Amino acid sequence: MDPRDLPSVDALAGDLAGEFDVPRSLLITTARRAIDEAREATQSGSPVDPATIAADRLHALASSRLRGVVNATGVLLHTNLGRAPTVGADVPRASNLEFDLETGTRGRRSAYLNALIASTVGAEAALVVNNNAGALFLALAALAGRDGRVAVSRGELIEIGGSFRLPDLMAASGVHLVEVGTTNRTRASDFTSAPGTVEAVLKVHPSNYRVEGFTEDVPFSEMPSVAESLGAPFIADVGSGLLDSNAPWVTGGPPAWLADEPGVQQTLDYGADVVLFSGDKLLGGPQAGVAVGGATFIERMAMHPIARALRINSPTIAMLTATFEAYASGAAASLPFWTMATAPAEVIETRTTAVLEASGTAGALVDGASLPGAGSVPGLTIPTPVLRLDGREEHVWRSLADFEPPVIAARRDGAAFVNLRSVHPDEDSIVAAALAGI
């Protein structure tokens, strides 16, 4: 192609407008860059079609645009699909976000939510920020301070999703990491014999992996006395946000897959000064990082300059308020995550059979498993009957994902699997229609 034959930016953008429903500014930018790339390729002797470049790029962008999907993977808290289905998302156009209706003056953001959380878990005070990594960053910066020394077991120097590592987060917060113990064995004496003084003691629940065999650690129940002997506050990062290890909202008591999860209330009862946890994992709420504990420590966190950079907005406040009100009123079992997690296998089997029959698809009902997900309860699953679709794994998966709305299934061992435990019953008809179109 001669460079003089390349289309104008407006002409190419106009052609793309008929295929892609995106703002014209994005069409113009994409067209201009595609033409520039095509011109360079032509001059180097490898001509390419700018229309093809632009279309490929817009297809990729369009597929990444936020949209609703049906999660049929069986991973209940699927990080890539938004984790916990949330409640209470209706937010008025204007609200009393930071307005005191009694005095007509500026109020404190999240005042009701903070009081609700504290009373629900039995803490003196509470604070909510944008996510749990942010809560930990803030706790370290506020309670240990710049150049403060923070002791943590080597076996808990975790890496979370996206290659974010605890030592890096600690360094960014301005504190110095004091490693104690070994990867597989840490004792209380390792903390108390660490050289020098420490400004805080941190314990992190390894919620996304499991270490077995010749191991030893200091349980949450013993850490407060260790920290007290060092004259330092104890920060407990329990991660997944299980409010009560007894799970009183689950009929018949806590299921086996919760056996190793620390409870927020129990960790507070042990004497932790600050307990940190996520809002969108086992709690079943929106993305948030929650800090509960002693009023003095929480106030220091709230007054730290970085707290403003981590604060939450109105929709998050509304959703998290609805979530904690469900716990406070004894209605936690109705939260979408717990409804999915505790649904009897027989109910899932009945729904799956009905979907299979309605779709007319050739598939088999087999024994399978669901995962709580979101880096919680590693290695533990929930028994679940699933629909197995054999043959042409990629074709089946792609067909479901191309449906509107997309139905996201699991795929492995040459087959696609549809797991209705992670699907709301109201979406069963969507799954059936998607299966019928394979």
Where does each model-flagged region fall?
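Long amphipathic alpha-helical segments
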Residues: M1-L61
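Short Gly/Ser/Thr- and Asp/Glu-enriched loop/turn motifs at secondary-structure junctions
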Residues: L6-P7, V70-G74, L283-P286, I382, ...
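Glycine-rich phosphate-binding segment of PLP-dependent enzymes
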Residues: A31-R32, D36, A72-T73, G82-G104
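Long amphipathic N-terminal alpha/beta scaffold segment
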Residues: S44-T86
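A short linear hydrophobic-aromatic micro-motif
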Residues: R65-L66, A125-L127, F277, P405-A410
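Conserved PLP-enzyme active-site core in the AAT-like
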Residues: T105-S314, A318-A326, L356, A434
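Conserved PLP-dependent catalytic core of the aminotransferase class-I/II
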Residues: T316-I317, T321, E325-G373
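Conserved C-terminal alpha-helix-loop-beta "cap" of PLP-dependent enzymes
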Residues: E349-V431
